[in-house]
């Protein structure tokens, strides 16, 4: 796998089923195991998703919003986020000094970046400067915005 790959699913699909289907779609048949692990407390009930395909570690990320679930898999750390295109949040919680972009778009970019870093929302979004990061906007269903980061 040379680059990241993104796949959309119905949000009623479980995370494990979506990640397994995505891995098999990209990597072919094989034994797939997945779960979550919280780096802060060690719980497997929440935290960053993980996936193994035939005993090979694959970097994964997923996000749900409304009726949509998006997964990303890659050979290196990856983050993906999808949100409704209108969010109700204070700009100072999302925007770094000098940033003026649409809040929902900025939120998805920054959450994808924080997922790729492995910190998630434990890092304040206002500390992330988009100009210093690697991300791309993804095509999303009408009424939604999505982003991918590495």
Could you say what each language-model-derived stretch is?
Residues 1-150:
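Core catalytic alpha/beta fold that binds nucleotide/phospho-ligands
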């Amino acid at each position: 796998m040379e680059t990241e790959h993104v796949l959309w699913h119905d949000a009623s699909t479980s995370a494990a089923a979506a990640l397994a289907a995505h891995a098999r779609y990209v990597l072919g048949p094989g034994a797939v195991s997945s779960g979550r692990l919280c780096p802060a407390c060690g719980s497997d009930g929440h935290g960053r998703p993980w996936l193994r395909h035939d005993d090979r570690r694959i970097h994964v990320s997923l996000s749900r919003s409304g009726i949509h679930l998006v997964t990303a898999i890659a050979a290196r750390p990856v983050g993906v986020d999808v949100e409704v295109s209108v969010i109700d949040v204070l700009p100072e919680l999302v925007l770094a000094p000098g940033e003026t972009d649409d809040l929902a778009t900025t939120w998805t970019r920054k959450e994808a970046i924080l997922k790729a870093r492995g910190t998630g929302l434990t890092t304040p979004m206002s500390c992330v400067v988009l100009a210093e990061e690697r991300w791309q906007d993804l095509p999303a269903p009408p009424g939604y915005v999505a982003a991918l980061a590495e």
